[in-house]
Amino acid sequence: MNREIYDFVAIGIGPFNLSLASLSAPLRGVRTLFLDKKSGFDWHPGMLIETSTLQNPFLADLVSLADPRSEYSYLNYCKLTNRIYSYYMRENHYLSRAEYTRYCQWVAARLPNLRFGCDVQGVLHDPESHSYLVTGQHTMSGQRFMFRCRKLVLGLGSQPYLPACCDRRAAPFIHSADYLRHKYELQGRASITIVGSGQSAAEVFHDLLRESGRHDYSLAWITRSPRFFQMENTKLTLELISPDYTEYFHDLPEARRQEILTQQNSLYKGINASLINQIYDLLDEKVHDGDNRYTLLTNSELRACRYDPLQERFQLDFQHLDCDRPFSHATDGLVLATGYSHEIPACINPIHDRIAWNADGSYRIGRNYAIDHEGSEIFVQNTGLLSHGVTNPDLGFCCYRNSQILRELTGTEHYRIETRTALQEFSPPADGVLKHRPARRAERGPTVAARPLMDIHRATL
């Protein structure tokens, strides 16, 4: 047994906890440990499609929005891997998923506080020492381990969500999370159907559409959504992914928060506008060349899924929501791009009574991301959509959240936590009167001729 007492142990090493590890590693006197069952960092390997990109610019890396000088920044990664000038020449601020994964793996290899291959199987509380015991097994050797810590961070991520009518034990369908692993087999089918309408569905459809010229499959894309809508990324709308809005959202009644989230799907469930346009242009080109084997249909909800093992075909039943009319659809290959859901990890069952729960069995998450009754010992990553809104799954917000969590874990604000970042207001005035802000009196002085605008990026001395 390791006798050292860590200030906190984090379970799970995805991007959010990897960010926390990167921000905590340089802190003197802060003892941390991050555990994960996987053999190394691997983020959505089934969706590392060649053309897929992140929805956030490179500044939304693991550390820059908290500490731009960090050695674990994406720009430092580019510098140390001799890629910074080529990245500058590309003039593209959006990373591919594969590039982001390589960057995260580069960071993970340099952090001293990560332990992969550690399957956490239980968390116990020791009331005498006011500490937690994290127990489990090394996946390679089978040897047991036990670590003692004062506080916990849970960052176990999400699991592929399947519609209620789909039973993986009865049918060999594929969730988009496993797409690349089954892609070759899938392309040998006579017909392929994708169900879903978000970014993952669009990336899978686009990938199969691009390569359809080398194969004979027909391709269908069916979604319950009323349209293939793009992700909103205008600047004032993006301020809904800000500390200011998170504070406002968290203070609203729960019923109102639920209503708002249904209105904000396009903020985190939409498709990149560039990808939508690429799909349209490619479809248009193929159709005009006489290739008509593609079907796109909206407003259609999957109600039943049956698989015939003899014919190796799926029989799908849909309900068209606008027309209120059922229809059936047969396909040889099925990809469910139906998103992800969060599950309560079994390892925390022994400390169930120390955690605050909602009536529906979900965590009751405090404003500081704590879920224990004291609000100071157990923290969570990426499970607070209803409590904290659309900032919850956003990569660009993880540095701000982790700066807050680190402050709660250590009692010190190691990284500056901005109190206001938005240019707009979200709450009405406390006194019930909205007043104009006073104008700043213009200073009198000589008139200066306007200077011509320059392309700063290409400016030379």
UniProtKB/Swiss-Prot annotation:
EC main group: oxidoreductase
Leader sequence segment: none
Keyword line: FAD, Flavoprotein, NADP, Oxidoreductase
Cofactors named for this entry: FAD
Gene Ontology process terms (BP): biosynthetic process
Record-linked InterPro entries: FAD/NAD-bd_sf, Lys/Orn_oxygenase
Binding positions for FAD per the UniProt entry: V9, A10, I11, G12, I13, G14, P15
Enzyme Commission code: 1.-.-.-
Highest taxon above the source species: Bacteria
Pathway: Siderophore biosynthesis; alcaligin biosynthesis
Family membership noted in the UniProt record: Belongs to the lysine N(6)-hydroxylase/L-ornithine N(5)-oxygenase family.
Name of the protein in its database record: Alcaligin biosynthesis enzyme
